[in-house]
């Protein structure tokens, strides 16, 4: 599942454009594609500005240089796509020679959020490899005179946030169930949404605890007539990111809705019949949108929010020669 399963057209209607007349002149509602495209555009924009990947993205053969000076720091790498969910393959190669695999267990994530990993040999595998001159090699030290080898390490990994959904059961007579994720969320606290599919006499639900591996759900009273079925959605998307995307995605529908209040660029109009007249004024003009005040408010909120998110997610790259 993806972020678009959380930020849907209906989500935008129910939150950021609530109270706005979202119908065309003929009375038909705005089409879903208007909101879907606005959401997709907002997701891409926020991803680009923060330098992170929201939905799972598999990267094959990302190359990183080897420097002798990094030996004492256990070869730190900052991967190109963040946050890092898992590393599937770790290899070495000189130029275009065939890849030689290293144990994946050597890749230790030190900051999944910032894509930082280190190469730390494990005790059970270190004997199979030689460390001559600081660069790990399979056979001898033929490259040891070199202080720098470009593109020496090749890394396959998966980046992005985690979104899982499913159904769990609280057995009859019991009051608690564990939701276990298929993978650890590392540094991030998950968000959990619950829905009772079949109560079977059970009481209200609450989340007892959450962890990077899942959550514990309890019911106020045990089901009495059968097993209680519960649908869950659990993810680690930052709530501030969801808000930023919602604010940005709402601007396009608000722009269109403002034009349809009285017509594009029309600030007021009057109607007169048989000596009776009526005037209608709006906040729209040739240069201002009908919902301009809300748009300006959203833009200001977005600017403040993005400043905080950049400080949290952006990395500082330091290069040495």
Where are these regions (language model features)?
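A structural signal for short, hydrophobic beta-strand segments that form beta-sheets
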Residues: 204-212, 266-270, 283
């Amino acid at each position: 599942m993806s972020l678009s399963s959380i930020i849907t057209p209906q989500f935008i209607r129910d939150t950021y454009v609530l109270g706005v007349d979202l119908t065309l002149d003929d009375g038909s509602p705005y089409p879903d594609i208007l909101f879907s495209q606005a959401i997709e555009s907002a997701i891409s924009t926020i991803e680009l500005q923060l330098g992170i990947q929201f939905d799972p993205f598999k990267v094959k053969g990302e190359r990183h240089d080897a420097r002798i000076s990094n030996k004492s720091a256990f070869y730190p790498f900052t991967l190109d796509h963040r946050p890092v969910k898992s590393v599937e393959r770790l290899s070495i190669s000189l130029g275009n020679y065939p890849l030689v695999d290293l144990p994946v267990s050597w890749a230790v994530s030190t900051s999944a959020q910032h894509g930082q990993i280190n190469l730390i040999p494990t005790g059970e595998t270190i004997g199979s490899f030689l460390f001559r001159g600081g660069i790990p090699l399979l056979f001898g030290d033929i490259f040891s005179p070199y202080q720098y080898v470009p593109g020496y390490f090749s890394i396959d990994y998966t980046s992005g946030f985690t979104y899982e959904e499913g159904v769990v059961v609280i057995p009859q007579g019991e009051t608690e169930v564990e939701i276990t994720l298929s993978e650890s969320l590392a540094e991030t606290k998950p968000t959990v949404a619950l829905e009772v599919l079949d109560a079977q006499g059970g009481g209200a639900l609450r989340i007892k605890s959450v962890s990077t591996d899942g959550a514990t759900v309890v019911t106020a009273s045990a089901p009495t007539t059968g097993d209680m079925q519960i649908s869950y959605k659990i993810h680690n998307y930052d709530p501030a990111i969801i808000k930023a995307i919602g604010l940005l995605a709402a601007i396009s529908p608000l722009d269109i809705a403002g034009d349809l209040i009285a017509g594009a660029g029309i600030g007021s109009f009057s109607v007169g019949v048989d000596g009776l007249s009526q005037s209608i004024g709006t906040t729209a003009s040739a240069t201002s949108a009908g919902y301009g005040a809300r748009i300006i408010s959203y833009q200001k909120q977005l600017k403040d929010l993005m400043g905080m998110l950049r400080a949290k997610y952006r990395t500082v790259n330091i290069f040495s020669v």
